[in-house]
């Protein structure tokens, strides 16, 4: 088992470093096949260990070496694989292996394939480090490196100015969250004296609640930035400037799920901070609703799918706010499969279009040209809409039901917000399907003449993920949601979640309402677009104003730039001008220099030849001499100290 754990970590590392150092000698063909093979082997090992954990739910630890040992603080590079970790590894390795295979076909004409595959493997490696660490320090190391790698991947096409700006936006927004992560780690180290999970979780109930609230607020802000929660979500749609395989990997199983994993791993602390749970619940509700509203007013294919990711991350956050950690984890796993399939299908569509346009208004009539892609994206969309029998139905609807089964006014309100978000999901999903495949062609003849299905490297991963999107939820539901299962219960702590209340006390109306609404809204969207053509005919100025606000992401970029970034820069400039180069500058080296220069100048003026200045200086020197003599006589000051001063004054007077 220890060898298996080592291989899960080592193989992606080899897949990253070999192309980095020997890619030019090995060639892009060998590199693409080698990296894909190593990640696939890692995936198979993960599935084997998942099977082992089902029968024997005992975590396995791997201790490497000590990093820091200061007084009572002991930090080690230790790794642990438990049920929570293996679930994350299932999503990470499965999606990463599919993305590697997909990239062989998608990036076949790119001249920098070696660098691209090395970065993909690097991303996978550091994400594995993040989830397998047995303490917050190792988690933080992986956290920082996936932020760096995301910058390198989003800005992969370095000649595109927008790609570079988007990557910078993503990394700066994440650095804001990282600052709070560091704050949380410092408080944890101060309060608990360690960063190890086992010690922290075992003693959390002994710690003052205010300190626990401070810790979890800091960690939650870090998770908000990484998982694109409302208020820190601006970077998410901008990250679509990277290649489509990057979008598939980032938004399905790696970067955006890191924040959710951090909250799940900290569940044992969260249970003692009901205030933070309430905040998490409402931030998740605002996130899922705002993402849906923005998505229905967007027209960029990849950005709509990215906003759907934000919406589903909000659903996971709602589940965490309800203390339903197993529901959040199950939805994270299921969402990884159909979201990766959505992005890959979008990439297949973009790849088949001659000018690689991403505006769905320029599509239409592609059903007969891309039937295989149509089937895959339809399966993924229906799973996202939580249609019965598909993975999303088993992972998503139970979260919406749980909000109604918690017996509080706040949770009832969140139920209707989550329900509205589910309806909006149907709206933008059907919008993609209709404008891409069902509507009349909206492009030129040459585009449709050259439209074609992609090669086997692109279609094979889509087929495999389509299988997962259909059956993974049904196969795994008893493992994660079954009444008698304890697969993840020993590693996360759902003390406040009322599973039986959710299952048996809610009326069928509230259980079936999201499903019925999804079906009716889907039919309504098709009918309205087909027979009434309202999409481009909304000429009312008030409707256009509302549409424009949501199309601009609730003008969040403008608010961020004007009220936070601009004001922050002005404030920083004023502080630098008045404090750093003002008070400190004058009291520091420059002030001392000027003081000494002025004193020297005044001493030099004592030798002036004018009668008035000579009289004044003589009077001052006389007063000084008398004062010094009084010090010697009255206060018993050593005369040896006074003699040099007297000699200097007399020399200045008679020079």
From Swiss-Prot:
Gene Ontology CC entries for this record: mitochondrial inner membrane; respiratory chain complex I
Main location: mitochondrion
EC assignment: 7.1.1.2
Cellular compartment(s): Mitochondrion inner membrane
A Pfam family annotated for this UniProt entry: Proton_antipo_M
Example GO biological process: electron transport coupled proton transport
InterPro entries assigned to the protein according to its UniProt record, in alphabetical order: NADHpl_OxRdtase_5_subgr, ND/Mrp_TM, NU5C-like, Proton_antipo_N
Reaction(s) catalysed (UniProt annotation): a ubiquinone + NADH + 5 H(+)(in) = a ubiquinol + NAD(+) + 4 H(+)(out)
Membrane topology category: Multi-pass membrane protein
Any one GO molecular function term: NADH dehydrogenase (ubiquinone) activity
Main EC class the enzyme belongs to: translocase
TM segment ranges: 3-23, 34-54, 84-104, 116-136, 137-157, 180-200, 204-224, 244-264, 276-296, 304-322, 332-354, 370-390, 413-433, 456-476, 516-536, 629-649
Keyword set, alphabetical order: Electron transport, Membrane, Mitochondrion, Mitochondrion inner membrane, NAD, Respiratory chain, Translocase, Transmembrane, Transmembrane helix, Transport, Ubiquinone
Function: Core subunit of the mitochondrial membrane respiratory chain NADH dehydrogenase (Complex I) that is believed to belong to the minimal assembly required for catalysis. Complex I functions in the transfer of electrons from NADH to the respiratory chain. The immediate electron acceptor for the enzyme is believed to be ubiquinone.
PANTHER family assigned to the protein according to its UniProt record, in alphabetical order: NADH-UBIQUINONE OXIDOREDUCTASE CHAIN 5
Subunit structure, interactors included: Complex I is composed of 37 different subunits.
Family, per entry: Belongs to the complex I subunit 5 family.
Protein name as it appears in the record: NADH-ubiquinone oxidoreductase chain 5
Lineage summary: Eukaryota, Fungi, Dikarya, Ascomycota, Saccharomycotina
